[in-house]
Amino acid sequence: MKYLFINSSKDKAGINIRNNLEKLNNINNNCIIDFFETPKKLTELSKKDLPQDYDYYIFLSKHRSVSEKPTLTVHTSGNLTTDNSHGGNIEEVCCCDAILNTILLVNINKYNNLEKYKKLGFDVSFEAIHHAPTDLDVPSVFVEIGSSEKEWAIDEAGEIMANAIIDTISSIESKSYKKLDKVIAFGGGHYAPRFTKLSLSNKCFVGYIIPKYAKISEKVLQQLIQMQDFDYILFDWKGINSEDKKRYIEFFDKNNILWKKVKDLCY
């Protein structure tokens, strides 16, 4: 497999992660790993800006939030609605690999819980789909250090992310991971606490996450089921508006797509 690590020269967190990746000498020799740095913001990129012929794009990025809570996050990019204020095309999502996203999250959490890193006080979570790029047709994922300029420059945070990325690639290349169902997740807030918990408990592989606040069209629903390999749809049942839930279920039933509730996995 061929992996491209992408960072912006304007992004301190991305540079931090890249510098730590370049220090590692335990990279799997059976795969090809390349680096690509752009002067653009990552949210300004599209397919035409990136080298082609890669199997995976891994974006090394900062995360910003109003709370400035120290957080390490994972998500696939895209615009679920007609709001493209953070770049990309409206109602368009990048290709997603639930196995890649979830193993990344699990490995980030593993390193974050080591004694040498616990003092940093980072949370670990998924994020819902958001921002550009939106037009990438190979699996793409953002790994982000947040949520303020202080955290972006913490070298140990870059170490956590770099080690997690390399461990993830090693697992994918060797297929040395537990086989779990792959899901597309609907409901809950932006940081998807229930889906984060399920993934960290090894209940399933979570790919796309569609939050409660995104009322997505049938056009986007079609993209989701075409752009990610999945076994079924997973609903955070109380984390979705009833009207949206009804509309989504009608679409999935019409297309003979299996769906389940989060509580079905909480055994």
Curated annotation (Swiss-Prot):
Cofactor binding, per record: Binds 2 Zn(2+) ions per subunit.
Name under which the protein is recorded: D-aminoacyl-tRNA deacylase
Catalytic activity: a D-aminoacyl-tRNA + H2O = a tRNA + a D-alpha-amino acid + H(+); glycyl-tRNA(Ala) + H2O = tRNA(Ala) + glycine + H(+)
Taxonomic superkingdom: Archaea
UniProt family annotation: Belongs to the DtdA deacylase family.
Keyword Metal-binding: yes
Requisite cofactors: Zn(2+)
SUPFAM superfamilies: AF0625-like (SSF142535)
Subunit structure: Monomer.
Gene behind this protein: dtdA
GO biological process annotation, one example: D-amino acid catabolic process
Top-rank EC class of the record's enzyme: hydrolase
GO molecular function, one term: D-aminoacyl-tRNA deacylase activity
EC numbers: 3.1.1.96
Keyword Zinc belongs to the record: yes
Function: D-aminoacyl-tRNA deacylase with broad substrate specificity. By recycling D-aminoacyl-tRNA to D-amino acids and free tRNA molecules, this enzyme counteracts the toxicity associated with the formation of D-aminoacyl-tRNA entities in vivo.
NCBIfam families per the UniProt record, alphabetical: PRK03995.1-3
Keywords annotated in UniProt: Hydrolase, Metal-binding, Zinc
Organism field: Methanococcus aeolicus (strain ATCC BAA-1280 / DSM 17508 / OCM 812 / Nankai-3)
